[in-house]
Amino acid sequence: MNKWRLYYQVLNFGMIVSSALMIWKGLMVITGSESPIVLLSGSMEPAFHRGYLLFLTNRVEDPIRVGEIAVLRIEGRKIPIVHRVLKIHEKQNGHIKFLTKGDNNAVDDRGLYKQDQHWLEKKDVVGRARGFVPYIGIGTSLMNDYPKHKYEVLFLLGLFVLVHRE
């Protein structure tokens, strides 16, 4: 392989990565949410299955409603939780707290919250589901189950892009 072909392959790979990054950042601006999220468990079945890609919005002015699918970042947990808003508790001063539950879970999420926390607040919401693509994120779900294979797949994809000829 001559150096110009290698240069072309590296440049092509860079364009693919930068295009994906621009699309991602554009969606962040439009939706007000950091990124789409992949469901990693079956706790929201039958509405959403493991591997579904959820598109989120997180507009501050939108009130939280019972029945909405919320993506939550719980203090002390690395992976966000995707569950439905079960109950809302509103104080006289307008401060809202809420309780969540996975559709496929027998009990509410109080066992998942940090110790002595019984309700969530707006600050815990990463986004709210507004759309989905079925099973497109199953690869991400599998990589989460088998983390050591993540690096093998990334290496093979990078190698394929560099070696692939057009």
UniProtKB/Swiss-Prot annotation:
One of its GO terms (molecular function) is peptidase activity. GO terms for biological process: signal peptide processing. It comes from the Eukaryota. Disulfide bonds: none annotated. The chain crosses the membrane at residues 7-24. It is found in: Membrane. One of its GO terms (cellular component) is signal peptidase complex. Residues 1-6 are cytoplasmic. The gene is SEC11B. Residues 25-166 are extracellular. It is a single-pass type II membrane protein. It comes from Homo sapiens. The lineage of its organism: Eukaryota, Metazoa, Chordata, Craniata, Vertebrata. It catalyses: Cleavage of hydrophobic, N-terminal signal or leader sequences from secreted and periplasmic proteins. This is Putative signal peptidase complex catalytic subunit SEC11B. The active site is at S43. Keywords: Hydrolase, Membrane, Protease, Signal-anchor, Transmembrane, Transmembrane helix.
